[in-house]
Design a protein with these regions (language model features):
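Metal-ion/cofactor- or nucleotide/acyl-coenzyme-handling active-site neighborhoods
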Residues: 3-319
């Protein structure tokens, strides 16, 4: 973390008890746009990686349904027949997804720092992610790849250390957070960004909403691309378990462990400045998806988001 970020966060913390949230939120947003957006743009220019808004992302949309592929263990219970159905729709994987043999149409991943206790990133995780990208570069050469969180960590981050094989069809996105401690504050923040067209359908954009985890970004991308249905697969969040830890199906990666498996996934746990993903999804459904006429579903009920998010009708997998 840079000295500038530390100073700004210290200042914001000192203002928390003195400023109303609506004003604090605006100060934080303007600072983030000025500092982190500029840093993301500078990194893109320095490395010669195009920004996402140079690409007409609407050209990727073939269907009205987007399947989002997460890394929870329920992925391993999806039948071959269902995978055949999923393959007939547009798909977006994120973060650890390349460990899976199914290659999606889009792939989102974070420009993680080399090591950061605050970001829950260890040096081991960084090395594992980089090796994963190298091993899967050929399979993902024609996949549209979007790297996020570029403006947060500055020099000590993945975008400056990407394998050259990973550069084809790679784009930089700027992730826009809000500052919120409660559902009410999050609602205010999302309404603020909504007025700034962060959830408006568009052919070109590079500003992506993100709060609590990558799932919020991909849901917002689905809305902006004009999908009518978004189906979440492997978004379990019950424990810190991943599909690639199955010893029978994934013997090469089964020993990987980035946190105690018995603990709930960190995105499902509330923190001082981060409400749980269940609340984030609830607010997004109410404030963004429902007004836009977008339906959100789960592939199965093995998720901390159930029963808030319904299970998709089985007929969708018929092909």
């Amino acid at each position: 973390m840079t000295g500038v970020v530390i100073k700004i966060r210290s200042l914001l913390k000192s203002l928390v008890k003195r400023l109303p949230h609506s004003l604090l939120m605006r100060i934080y947003h303007r600072w983030h746009v000025r500092e982190c957006r500029a840093a993301a743009n500078t990194a893109a220019q320095q490395l010669g990686i195009p920004r996402l808004d140079t690409f007409d992302i609407s050209t990727l949309k073939r269907t009205d349904t987007l399947f989002v592929l997460g890394s929870g263990p329920s992925i391993n219970r999806i039948s071959p027949a269902r995978w055949k159905g999923i393959a007939s729709y547009d798909t977006a994987g994120f973060n650890f997804w390349p460990f899976h043999p199914f290659v999606p149409r889009m792939y989102f991943f974070e420009s993680i720092p080399y090591e950061s206790q605050e970001a829950n990133i260890s040096a081991e995780m960084y090395s594992v992610v980089k090796r994963m990208l190298i091993d899967r570069a050929a399979a993902y050469a024609r996949v549209t790849k979007i790297i996020t969180d570029v403006g947060v960590h500055r020099d000590t981050q993945l975008i400056f250390d990407l394998p050259s094989q990973w550069l084809p069809n790679l784009y930089v996105a700027y992730t826009v957070p809000v500052i919120a401690r409660t559902e009410t504050e999050l609602t205010i923040g999302i309404r603020y960004l909504k007025k700034r067209r962060l959830f408006t359908k568009a052919r070109r954009f590079w500003d992506l909403f993100k709060y609590c985890g990558s799932l919020s970004s991909i849901i917002s991308v689905g809305v902006r691309m004009g999908y009518r249905r978004i189906v979440l697969c492997g978004i379990d969040m019950g424990k810190q378990e991943y599909f690639f830890q199955d010893r029978e199906l994934f013997p090469r990666t089964a020993s990987l462990e980035f946190g105690p498996k018995e603990h709930r996934h960190y995105t499902a746990e509330g923190q001082q400045w981060m409400v749980p993903m269940q609340v984030v999804v609830s607010v997004l459904m109410r404030e963004v998806l429902e007004p836009a006429g977008v339906e959100l579903y789960l592939e199965n009920s093995a998720s901390a988001l159930a029963p808030l998010v319904p299970v998709v009708p089985t007929a969708i997998f018929a092909c």
